[in-house]
Amino acid sequence: MNINKLSVVIITYNEEKNIARCINSVKQIADEIIVVDSHSIDKTKEIAIRLGAKVIEHSFEGHIQQKNFALQQANYSWVLSLDADEALSEKLKNKIQEIKNNPTADGYTMNRLTYYCGRWIKHTGWYPDKKLRLVRKELAQ
């Protein structure tokens, strides 16, 4: 089975400092980018629209609820869910492209790197910090 089409969903609130980096990191693998914004009062929405994302405003009811709402907005059956302060490495983009061409599972975890004061935290249980981020929409929630 070939994924072919991939939706990327990003939840935001006042993320003008992060959203461009996040969106730019997924542009070459995403077939659509949807930003679900919790009524930001900064320039998050304007930046996302300028970069080609579809922006949907939705009041924040909780992290999981917002993620699930974002998932439901996706038009394709494969969805990559990100937070606005996250960005994909070239290596991860290449791996996702491979998965798009030949998926072998219904969901994929990714190791999240956590930075504090500009330094990657590699110890104390902070790495690997595996998160389920790439899923078949109809099997997730």
Stretches with model-predicted labels:
Residues D31, K45-Q73:
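Conserved donor nucleotide-binding strand/loop of the catalytic core
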Residues N24-I33:
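Short, acidic, metal-binding catalytic loop of nucleotide-sugar glycosyltransferases
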Residues S25, D37-E46, D83:
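A conserved acidic beta->alpha catalytic loop
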Residues V36, H58, L80-A84:
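Catalytic metal- and UDP-sugar-binding loop of GT-A-like glycosyltransferases, i.e.
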Residues M1-S25:
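N-proximal low-complexity "stem/linker" segments adjacent to membrane-targeting elements
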Residues A20, D42-L51, K91-L92:
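Acidic helix N-cap motif at the loop->helix transition within catalytic regions
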Residues N68-Q72, Y76-L82, S89-Q141:
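Catalytic-site signature of metal-activated, phosphate-bearing donor transferases
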